[in-house]
């Protein structure tokens, strides 16, 4: 594995290996017995992804080299590649990068030779592989397998990196992917069937809602009647199958794609997804560092629990 940029890099058995490792880490956390440094380079706002990577790194015993774009040499015209090489030069063992560009990885690769692994924490509208794997873990915990599930992804498909990553991975694992989107929010470059929300509700084993990505629209989308036409209302929620679960990558626009009272409903696994994100990212970091030969099995020790004084 060169850098971890896309879920398409992983075979089905590797995906299951990572989500099973993440599941194991919830109960039996590991720590690394050697000093490692992570450079977290976030060029877009982030709450869940940035914080869960930070917690994952700390749980593994990794030192975090934090980065603030507004106080960095990027303001002086430094390239992404030179910034990454700087982190490598001062001792970072791996980088976690989120960037608004769809092509930032190409910029890194064309810049020269980077000798440490990069983990994609979200690339423009293209991919969000770590979010995808935590979503897969959440489904795996619920159903024991991904194969055969009908997963409806509903919302702003056109601008969603989550939709793309999940659709690819779910298909590889044998699930049936169905999209549902308001007019103008479809992405017809992705070859999946579309249903209306009312049709999709009755099909779904998993209903994954997406917010409208206003920051990627040229003009602000009108949302006053979005919930009633395309979102999850209380009436639609009642039509979900008994075993169906509700997911959302967040941030959530309450009252737009979902009725606010449904965010923590019985079927909702939204906050469980967030919790799973820490352990999936721990597993991904371990997987990537192992692939690069940076860590080995003998570098893992059982994490000591902290005793309150």
Swiss-Prot record:
GO cellular component: cytosol
Described function: Catalyzes the condensation of carbamoyl phosphate and aspartate to form carbamoyl aspartate and inorganic phosphate, the committed step in the de novo pyrimidine nucleotide biosynthesis pathway.
Matching Pfam families: OTCace, OTCace_N
Catalytic activity, as annotated: carbamoyl phosphate + L-aspartate = N-carbamoyl-L-aspartate + phosphate + H(+)
An annotated Gene Ontology molecular function: aspartate carbamoyltransferase activity
InterPro entries cross-referenced by the UniProt entry: Asp/Orn_carbamoyltranf_P-bd, Asp/Orn_carbamoylTrfase, Asp/Orn_carbamoylTrfase_sf, Asp_carbamoyltransf, Asp_carbamoyltransf_Asp/Orn-bd
Species classification: Bacteria, Bacillati, Bacillota, Bacilli, Bacillales
Organism in which the protein naturally occurs: Oceanobacillus iheyensis (strain DSM 14371 / CIP 107618 / JCM 11309 / KCTC 3954 / HTE831)
Sequence positions that bind carbamoyl phosphate: 48-49, 98, 128, 131, 250-251
SUPFAM superfamilies in the cross-refs: Aspartate/ornithine carbamoyltransferase (SSF53671)
Keywords: Pyrimidine biosynthesis, Transferase
Name the record gives this protein: Aspartate carbamoyltransferase catalytic subunit
Disulfide cross-links: none
HAMAP family in the cross-refs: Asp_carb_tr
UniProt EC number: 2.1.3.2
Highest rank taxon of the organism: Bacteria
Gene Ontology biological process terms from the UniProt entry: 'de novo' pyrimidine nucleobase biosynthetic process; 'de novo' UMP biosynthetic process; amino acid metabolic process
Subunit field text: Heterododecamer (2C3:3R2) of six catalytic PyrB chains organized as two trimers (C3), and six regulatory PyrI chains organized as three dimers (R2).
Encoding gene (name): pyrB
Pathway: Pyrimidine metabolism; UMP biosynthesis via de novo pathway; (S)-dihydroorotate from bicarbonate: step 2/3
Enzyme class, UniProt record, top EC level: transferase
Binding residue positions for L-aspartate: 76, 161, 211
Keyword Transferase: yes
Similarity field: Belongs to the aspartate/ornithine carbamoyltransferase superfamily. ATCase family.
């Amino acid at each position: 594995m060169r850098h971890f940029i896309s879920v398409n890099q992983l075979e089905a058995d590797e995906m299951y290996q990572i989500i099973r490792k993440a599941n194991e880490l919830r109960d039996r956390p590991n720590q690394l017995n050697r000093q490692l440094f992570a450079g977290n380079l976030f060029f877009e706002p982030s709450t869940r992804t940035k914080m869960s990577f930070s917690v994952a790194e700390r749980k593994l015993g990794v030192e975090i080299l934090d980065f603030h774009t507004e106080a960095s040499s990027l303001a002086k015209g430094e390239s992404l590649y030179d910034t990454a090489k700087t982190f490598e030069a001062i001792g970072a063992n791996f980088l976690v990068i989120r960037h608004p560009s769809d092509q930032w990885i190409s910029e890194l690769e064309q810049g020269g030779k980077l000798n440490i692994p990069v983990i994609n924490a979200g690339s423009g509208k293209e991919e969000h592989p770590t979010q995808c794997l935590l979503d897969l873990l959440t489904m795996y915990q619920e159903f024991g397998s991904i194969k055969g599930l009908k997963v409806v992804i509903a919302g702003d498909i056109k601008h969603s990196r989550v939709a793309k990553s999940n659709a690819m991975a779910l298909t590889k694992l044998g699930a049936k992917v169905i999209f549902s989107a308001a007019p103008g929010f479809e992405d017809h470059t992705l070859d999946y069937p579309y249903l209306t929300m009312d049709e999709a509700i009755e099909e779904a084993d998993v209903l994954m809602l997406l917010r409208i990505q206003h920051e990627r629209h040229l003009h602000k989308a009108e949302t006053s009647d979005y919930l009633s036409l395309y979102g999850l209302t209380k009436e639609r929620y009642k039509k979900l199958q008994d075993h169906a679960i509700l997911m959302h990558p967040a941030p959530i626009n309450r009252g737009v794609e979902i009725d606010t009272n449904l965010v923590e409903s019985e079927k909702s696994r939204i906050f469980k997804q967030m919790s799973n994100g820490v352990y999936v990212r721990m597993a991904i970091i371990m997987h990537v560092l192992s692939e690069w030969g940076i860590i080995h099995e003998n570098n893992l020790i059982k994490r000591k629990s902290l005793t309150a004084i």
